[in-house]
């Protein structure tokens, strides 16, 4: 043997017996290896020099900087131009040659976003990391090591070539040339160590990579010669010294570069904030990448202290959403030649990463068979030690160990590339959804059947521009697209390589099986192929169920969102139980689909469990009965190991098919959403060349091209530029629609709509007057951000203190800021929840006024404020200095106030212009009715104009302050002055803290508490069900082990008899051909193609075969059974959890909803519930199964080789520490990832509700940037969570490799005491142990991370509840009979730490009397009303109704006994009937009567029988607008978004009329209704509620002037309480002052006197 290995004869074998031959060393390792590397090096450098010379020297192309490519758009050369150019003043900002698409693109293009944050600061700063002393020392040391190699090879060439057979001339010369080339390369790198030589930087390419590849290949080529020295097959001293020096120097060179932090060029890190540590990836060595050591410092810190948000590192520059989406949009817009669907664009965009992922997956799949291939060799050695030398057996064990490590590296890299694609794809999908939601139409209003796509089901959009309801109709579906669909689509990318892995592993396994079993393996393949269609059908069915489930989930989330958005009205009417029942009905449908999916999944699991058993049994049967072979231990266990390896990819393929189908469903939903129609705003609006016109030219406009129930018809209006234009008309006449048409939100059927400009806000140029040619818009229902008051007013405009103060004063907000504890730094909550309706409206108005827009559109902004505030706003804001030379188009019902300074009045009626022109001309035509106040107001226009001119002459800086007595009661001025002084002395930080309303989302620290597990397990079914399931798992695992043991028994009963001659001839032929290069002693008779065949003794083969099948089927049945039982228990637990937290949230105190954004609540009910529904149970099952698998493996190996116990202890300790360190960081990252999702949902919710305002301001870019920022805040913990996962997986694999090595080691130590069957069981389980251990830690971490969802949901079990079903006394059945109210010494706070908002208020209300409550906005009027519903519990005092203290009355009874018509009218998706009579308590005739009484339908229509059938016929014609209230089945969108604000208020009034309550409360119920309709409704209220007690909050003093008493509130105190006429007799009274400031004093005195006289006369009667 030694002679053959070192013979000089021309034997061309590379390997002989147990070692590489001398020919193999000299020819393949010393000659071919350096030759190939030399050719590669020369070609690489030559190609790079040619490429750079040709492109940059010949073609003169600009060399691109990768940083600049990311920072700046390559398509926008003006990207970095100044935002404001003070040297350029122009009125025409629109390039008339610019296409409509280009204009739209400038608004919504993600590619054109600037690399700045929302606040205008740079997005981040790239910083170059230069080489330090250590890195430079590395290159110097490398230089000398390469030089030493040149010297060594020169010495060998001169002294030993042809003298020693190890050193051939061609090999030595080639090696010398190779090292000379490497010496030149390292010299160039050393010379350019500071990157000073442009030639080296520009031409040769990445020389560092060339060096590294060469060193690595040369080091690997020396491993086998070094082994030859180790086993004494090379004995020549010089040869031994040569190979030892080569492996030493090559290893040193390899390690120098392997651990180098900075490679070819300087590393670049990207810093976004000073307190955020940038990602260390750019300065991480290859070693750090492979073993994930770059995360060590983070893991160590997380172990020592609980990490905070600031401790989470930043992302790599290329991973930030801004750069990702920018590159994606550039790719789609410029590199995609034809329009492709979204999914294909994603695929091609990430193709490079996916190819790399597949490369690593392919490599890992092939290497994963090394242990199995070597398993047979080891078992053959155990069975017959003469078959190979012992050093070869040790070599096999070592290779198994190394092979497992290489597989771990490959799998980790494949998963990491996939995860990187995942976070980038998630950024793209969410940003595309968000951008689409900003730019799509809002006018569609369709109802789809329930089996349609869920996005379409919820596609209910606003048709009137009301910001409160613009997008809430489909908000649930959009949240679902983000929270679930975007995640599912992006998540699949992390595992796409599994398809390739499954394919490669299947092919390799089948090839090896064929070599092992021959045609018997084909039988197994055919069975697998036969099972594929069935599994495909099951996977498809699971996908169909998932699609249906997502549709129902959309419906549930929509219903939840609707309930949480309207929680106040639900509590007012005590509808919690009804909504809970409706939501739970949907929930049951969802859970039934989940259960069905689980059953199908279990059937699929059974098939995947049983398939390997059937395949193995069939193959063995064919092998024995047809081929006539006898099963031996090596063959049996090698086959079992291969079938196990085959099962893994098939299992993975099963799961992946299911996941891919689910992801395809999600991707289709996203695609459908992205395919929805965009807004036609930029296509249909005509931009005025002079930049100053608002006009309609023969325009006919509807909300939808196909649905034209309401139209603006034949409009011809030319609005006055730089002047006040007022649009008036009755409720539902189309006033808001007209503004929406100007904003481009409606559908232009014909004609033209001319606007002055449509430029994006970031491109606006400020003119000499400080204005921009843009539009500001204030909606009818105020839209506010969940931020401070100040930030809402600024709306990201630069802060100008003088202008800001002037705006605050002009909008009457100065005193409100003095009342608020934190002033303008007060957080106003979601939708401005902490402010009154009037305050919200004025903040919204202040935003429009503060903007530098030259054109302002105001939609009924005076309706929510009291009369004197309305007068102040009109004089100082709408017609004040700040509005000078600005075009203002105002929609208003308050014609007496608003017409006097109007240049143009447009009167609308039923969608047509009834008349337009100068208000005096229209007055003379009698178009304004007989109201004397209107007449006097218009006729005094000349005087008002003079006053306006006087005000206009006052400069902004000298804008007069608001007189304290003008906006408050005189005797309170000193109080507020003192408060103002006190406030000014406090720091802004203190004010900010005082102003905080929204609580930070809570985050537990450390391990998920044991109480959380106990709580969940109790709901899961308690210890009984857990114990039962655990026993099923144990029995299933015992059966699995029993199968292997049975195979051992089967094979052990065979004895050697004879070898079939035909098999011998085949083996000899194959061996002869295979031994051309490699010769194995003994393997010419025993190869992978066959094994020694032994006839059986004892039981027959059929006996073993049948029992093997029985065990396999039993194990599969148990596996499927435990799966379905686990799913059933999990679904039942999920049902209970959902029901409990829904009940808790719906019955929580209203303060919870004020302090908790809806997006945060929706996060609990969407993503967290989805995790509990679909992820937690499978993860628990998987983790428990992996635990049993690992424990059984360790016990089994220890039983077979007791010495393994020492390894098991060490392995267990290592696993504990690795798991401990991992869990410390990962659980916190998971919590931060969960918390950081809520702001994304909240931001979606806010911005989509205000989409009309955002588009009006042209501020889409800023909101898109903010969305990207919030995505990044979520991506950071998400990304590092999965990097931590890779950190864990690598270490688990390393430790698992020790198990394989230990098992092999102790088998060889105990070789004389073991049979091959026991050794086969030990090694087979050791090979699979690593995978099981990895999944154990990974799945346990997933369990804990998903238990975080349980933990977060459990928090809502501790929400403070309203005292339902708690009562000290039970009122009589007819209570309240009289309606008498007594309020005594009442004080209220919104929260214990907040100041009192109601202060010692006392008053009484007689039965059946009517009380008007008036006062400034924010005076506490609405708070008094809510106190009657016990939204706030009294700090002092009490409220009694009919002499019963309401604090002792059951809440449900109380709230159903009184009725409120709230300030913000709330309707629900459904029909007119379901909104008025949700629980079918009234007849259609009663409902029509209620509609008639609130003037939504006329008596004439009702008498003509305009019922459902006739109205349906009428609605088929589009010639005239149809009254939809004639058909009770007419659809109402969520929030009533397809009705005007006034119509919604009337609907709410009609709903209350139906209930005929004894006490009715009206909170600005007619604020958005025209005065004429208001008068009729007030008459209806007086008539219909004669026997009821009425409390009305009103800003229109005329509405309550004839009431029995007026309650004047100010700053939470009662200032006056008497008959209105009595109050007016006192000219010093606050009420008199209010009437005086309203401009209606004389009329109000007359009406009050008339009511007073009538009351006196009625008493006499």
Curated annotation (Swiss-Prot):
It is a multi-pass membrane protein. It is found in: Vacuole membrane. Residues 445-468 are annotated as: Disordered. ATP 1 binds at residues 729-736. CDD domains: ABC_6TM_VMR1_D1_like, ABC_6TM_VMR1_D2_like, ABCC_MRP_domain1, ABCC_NFT1. Glycans are attached at residues 6, 97. Residues 694-935, 1381-1636 form the ABC transporter domain. The modification Phosphoserine is found at residues 936, 940, 955. One of its GO terms (molecular function) is ATPase-coupled monocarboxylic acid transmembrane transporter activity. The keyword S-adenosyl-L-methionine does not apply. InterPro entries: AAA+_ATPase, ABC1_TM_dom, ABC1_TM_sf, ABC_transporter-like_ATP-bd, ABC_transporter-like_CS, ABC_transporter_C-like, P-loop_NTPase. Its main location: membrane. Residues 55-74, 155-166, 227-345, 415-495, 541-602, 666-1053, 1136-1178, 1222-1292, 1337-1661 are cytoplasmic. Keywords: ATP-binding, Calcium, Calcium transport, Glycoprotein, Ion transport, Membrane, Nucleotide-binding, Phosphoprotein, Repeat, Transmembrane, Transmembrane helix, Transport, Vacuole. Residues 1-33, 96-133, 188-205, 367-393, 517-519, 624-644, 1075-1114, 1200, 1314-1315 are lumenal. Pfam families: ABC_membrane, ABC_tran. Vacuolar class C ABC transporter which regulates the translocation of phosphatidylcholine to the vacuole lumen, the release of lumenal calcium stores, and acts as a negative regulator of vacuole fusion. Exhibits ATP-dependent bile acid transport. PANTHER family: ABC TRANSPORTER ATP-BINDING PROTEIN_PERMEASE VMR1-RELATED, ATP-BINDING CASSETTE SUB-FAMILY C. Present with 3000 molecules/cell in log phase SD medium. This is ATP-dependent bile acid permease. The gene is YBT1.
């Amino acid at each position: 043997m030694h002679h053959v290995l070192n013979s000089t004869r021309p034997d061309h074998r590379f390997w002989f017996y147990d070692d590489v031959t001398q020919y193999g060393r000299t020819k393949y390792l010393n000659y071919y290896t350096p030759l190939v590397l030399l050719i590669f090096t020369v070609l690489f450098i030559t190609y790079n020099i040619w490429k750079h010379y040709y492109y940059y020297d010949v073609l003169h192309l600009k060399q691109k900087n990768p940083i600049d490519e990311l920072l700046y758009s390559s398509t926008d050369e003006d990207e970095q131009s100044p935002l404001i150019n003070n040297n350029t003043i122009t009125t025409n900002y629109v390039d008339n040659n610019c296409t409509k698409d280009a204009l739209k693109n400038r608004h919504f293009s993600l590619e054109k976003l600037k690399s700045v944050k929302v606040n205008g600061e740079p997005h981040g700063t790239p910083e170059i990391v230069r080489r330090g002393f250590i890195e430079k020392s590395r290159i110097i040391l490398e230089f000398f090591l390469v030089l030493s190699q040149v010297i060594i090879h020169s010495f060998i060439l001169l002294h030993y070539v042809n003298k020693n057979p190890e050193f051939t001339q061609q090999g030595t010369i080639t090696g010398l040339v190779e090292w000379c080339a490497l010496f030149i390369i390292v010299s160039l790198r050393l010379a350019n160590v500071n990157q000073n030589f442009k030639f080296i930087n520009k031409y040769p390419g990445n020389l560092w990579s060339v060096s590294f590849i060469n060193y690595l290949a040369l080091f690997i080529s020396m491993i086998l010669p070094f082994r030859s020295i180790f086993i004494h097959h090379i004995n020549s001293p010089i040869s031994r010294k040569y190979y030892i020096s080569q492996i030493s120097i090559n290893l040193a060179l390899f390690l120098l570069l392997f651990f180098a932090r900075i490679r070819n060029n300087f590393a670049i890190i990207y810093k976004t904030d000073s307190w955020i540590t940038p990602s260390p990836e750019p300065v991480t060595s290859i070693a750090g990448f492979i073993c994930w050591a770059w995360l060590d410092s983070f893991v160590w810190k997380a172990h020592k202290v609980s990490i905070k948000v600031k401790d989470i590192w930043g992302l790599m520059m290329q991973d930030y959403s801004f750069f990702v989406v920018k590159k994606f949009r550039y790719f789609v817009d410029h590199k995609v030649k034809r329009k492709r669907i979204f999914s294909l664009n994603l695929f091609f965009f990430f193709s490079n990463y996916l190819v790399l992922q597949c490369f690593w997956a392919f490599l890992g799949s092939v290497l994963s068979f090394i242990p199995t291939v070597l398993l047979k060799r080891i078992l053959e050695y155990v069975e017959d030690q003469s078959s190979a030398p012992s050093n070869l057996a040790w070599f096999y064990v070592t290779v198994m160990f190394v092979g497992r490590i290489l597989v771990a590296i490959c799998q980790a890299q494949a998963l990491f590339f996939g995860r990187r694609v995942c976070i980038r794809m998630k950024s793209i999908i969410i940003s595309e959804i968000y951008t689409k939601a900003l730019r799509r139409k809002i006018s569609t209003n369709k109802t789809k059947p329930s089996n349609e796509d869920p996005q379409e089901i919820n596609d209910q959009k606003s048709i009137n521009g009301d910001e409160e309801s613009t997008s809430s109709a489909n908000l649930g579906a959009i949240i679902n697209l983000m929270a679930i669909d975007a995640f599912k689509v992006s998540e699949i990318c992390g595992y796409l390589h599994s398809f390739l892995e499954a394919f490669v592993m299947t092919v390799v396994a089948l090839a090896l099986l064929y070599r092992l079993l021959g045609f018997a393996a084909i039988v197994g393949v055919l069975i697998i192929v036969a099972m594929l269609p069935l599994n495909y059908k099951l996977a498809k069915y699971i996908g169909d169920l998932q699609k249906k489930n997502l549709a129902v989930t959309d419906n549930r989330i929509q219903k939840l969102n609707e309930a949480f958005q309207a929680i106040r009205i639900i509590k007012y009417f005590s509808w919690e139980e009804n909504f809970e029942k409706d939501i739970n009905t949907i929930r049951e449908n969802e859970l039934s689909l989940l259960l069905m999916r689980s059953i199908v999944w279990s059937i699929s699991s059974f098939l995947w469990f049983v398939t390997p058993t059937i395949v193995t049994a069939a193959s063995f049967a064919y092998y024995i009965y047809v081929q006539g072979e006898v099963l031996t231990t090596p063959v049996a266990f090698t086959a079992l190991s291969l079938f196990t390896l085959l099962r893994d990819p098939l299992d993975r393929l099963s799961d992946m098919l299911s996941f891919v189908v689910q992801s395809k469903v999600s991707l289709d939903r996203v695609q459908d959403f992205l395919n929805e129609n965009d807004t036609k705003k930029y296509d249909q609006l005509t931009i005025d060349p002079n930049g100053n016109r608002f006009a309609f030219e023969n325009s006919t406009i509807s909300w939808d091209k196909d649905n034209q129930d309401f139209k603006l018809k034949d409009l011809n209006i030319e609005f006055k530029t730089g002047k006040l234009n007022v649009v008036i008309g009755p409720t539902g006449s189309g006033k808001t629609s007209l503004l929406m048409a100007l904003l481009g939100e409606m559908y232009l059927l014909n004609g033209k709509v001319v606007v002055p400009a449509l430029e994006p806000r970031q491109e606006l140029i400020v003119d000499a007057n400080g204005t921009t040619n843009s539009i500001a818009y204030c909606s009818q229902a105020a839209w506010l951000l969940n931020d401070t008051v100040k930030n809402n007013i600024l709306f990201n405009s630069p802060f100008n203190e003088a202008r800001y103060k002037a705006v605050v004063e002009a909008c009457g907000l100065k005193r409100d800021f003095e009342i608020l504890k934190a002033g303008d730094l007060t957080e106003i909550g979601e939708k401005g929840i902490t402010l009154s309706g009037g305050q919200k409206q004025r903040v919204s108005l202040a935003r429009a006024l503060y903007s530098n827009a030259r054109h302002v559109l105001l939609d009924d902004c005076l309706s929510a404020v009291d009369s004197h505030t309305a007068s102040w706003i009109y004089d100082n804001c709408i017609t004040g200095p700040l509005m000078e030379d600005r075009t203002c188009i105002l929609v208003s019902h308050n014609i007496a106030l608003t017409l006097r300074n109007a240049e143009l009045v447009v009167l609308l009626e039923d969608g047509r212009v009834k008349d337009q022109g100068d208000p005096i001309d229209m007055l003379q035509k009698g178009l304004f009715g007989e109201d004397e106040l209107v007449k006097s107001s218009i006729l005094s226009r000349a005087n008002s104009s003079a006053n306006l001119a006087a005000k206009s002459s006052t400069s902004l800086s000298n804008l007069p302050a608001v007189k304290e007595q003008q906006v408050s009661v005189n005797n309170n001025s000193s109080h507020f002055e003192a408060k103002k002084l006190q406030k000014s002395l406090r720091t802004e930080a203190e004010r900010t803290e005082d102003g905080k309303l929204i609580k930070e989302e809570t985050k537990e620290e450390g391990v998920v508490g044991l109480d959380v597990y106990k709580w969940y397990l109790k709901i899961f079914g308690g210890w009984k069900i857990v114990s039962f399931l655990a026993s099923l798992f144990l029995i299933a695992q015992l059966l699995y082990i029993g199968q292997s043991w049975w195979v051992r028994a089967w094979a052990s009963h065979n004895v050697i008899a004879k070898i079939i001659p035909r098999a011998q001839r085949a083996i000899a032929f194959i061996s002869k051909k295979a031994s051309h290069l490699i010769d194995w002693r003994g393997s010419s008779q025993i190869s992978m193609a066959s094994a020694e065949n032994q006839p059986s003794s004892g039981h027959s083969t059929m006996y073993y075969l049948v029992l093997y099948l029985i065990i396999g089927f039993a194990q599969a049945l148990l596996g499927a059974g435990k799966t379905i039982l686990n799913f059933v228990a999990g679904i039942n637990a999920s049902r209970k959890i959902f029901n409990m937290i829904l009940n808790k949230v719906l019955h929580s105190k209203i303060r919870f909803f004020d302090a908790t954004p809806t997006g945060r609540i929706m996060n609990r009910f969407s993503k967290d519930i989805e995790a509990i529904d679909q992820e937690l149970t499978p993860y628990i099952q998987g983790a428990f199964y992996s635990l049993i698998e690992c424990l059984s493996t360790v016990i089994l190996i220890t039983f077979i080789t007791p010495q393994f116990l020492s390894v098991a202890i060490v392995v267990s300790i290592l696993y504990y520490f690795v798991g401990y360190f991992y869990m410390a960081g990962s659980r916190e990252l998971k919590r931060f990832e969960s918390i950081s999702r809520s702001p994304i949902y909240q931001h979606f919710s806010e911005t989509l509700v205000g989409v009309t305002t955002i588009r009006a301001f042209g501020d889409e870019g800023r909101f898109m940037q903010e969305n990207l920022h919030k995505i990044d805040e979520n991506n950071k913990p998400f990304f590092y969570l999965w990097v931590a996962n890779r950190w864990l997986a690598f270490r688990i694999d390393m430790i698992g490799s020790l198990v394989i090595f230990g098992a092999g080691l102790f088998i060889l130590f105990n070789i004389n005491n073991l049979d091959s069957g026991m050794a086969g069981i030990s090694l087979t389980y050791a090979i699979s142990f690593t995978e099981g251990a990895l999944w154990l830690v990974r799945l346990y971490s997933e369990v804990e991370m998903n238990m975080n969802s349980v933990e977060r949901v459990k928090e809502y079990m501790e929400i403070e509840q309203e005292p339902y079903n708690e009562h000290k006394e039970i009122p009589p059945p007819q209570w309240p009979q009289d309606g008498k109210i007594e309020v005594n010494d009442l004080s209220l706070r919104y929260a214990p730490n907040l100041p009192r908002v109601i202060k010692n208020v006392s008053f009484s209300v007689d039965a059946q009397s009517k009380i008007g409550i008036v006062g400034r906005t924010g005076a506490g009027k609405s708070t008094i009303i809510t106190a009657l519903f016990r939204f706030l519990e009294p700090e002092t005092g009490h409220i009694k109704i009919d002499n019963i203290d309401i604090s002792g009355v059951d809440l449900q009874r109380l709230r159903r006994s009184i009725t409120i018509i709230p300030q913000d009218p709330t309707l629900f998706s459904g029909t007119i009937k379901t909104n008025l009579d949700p629980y079918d308590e009234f007849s259609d005739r009663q409902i029509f009567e209620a509609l008639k009484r609130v003037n939504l339908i006329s008596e004439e229509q009702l008498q003509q029988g305009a019922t459902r059938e006739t109205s349906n016929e009428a609605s088929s014609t589009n010639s005239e607008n149809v009254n939809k209230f004639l058909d009770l089945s007419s659809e109402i969108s969520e929030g009533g978004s397809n009705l005007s604000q006034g119509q919604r208020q009337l609907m709410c009034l009609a709903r209350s009329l139906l209930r005929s309550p004894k006490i009715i409360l009206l909170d600005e119920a007619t604020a958005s209704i025209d005065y004429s309709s208001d008068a009729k409704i007030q008459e209806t209220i007086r008539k219909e509620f004669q026997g009821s007690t009425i409390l009305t909050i009103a800003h229109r003093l005329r509405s309550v002037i004839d009431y029995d008493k007026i309650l004047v509130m100010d700053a939470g105190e009662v200032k006056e309480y008497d008959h209105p006429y009595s109050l007016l007799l006192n000219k010093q009274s606050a009420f008199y002052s209010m009437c005086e400031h309203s401009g209606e004093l004389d009329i109000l005195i007359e009406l009050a006197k008339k009511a007073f006289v009538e009351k006196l006369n009625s008493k006499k009667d």
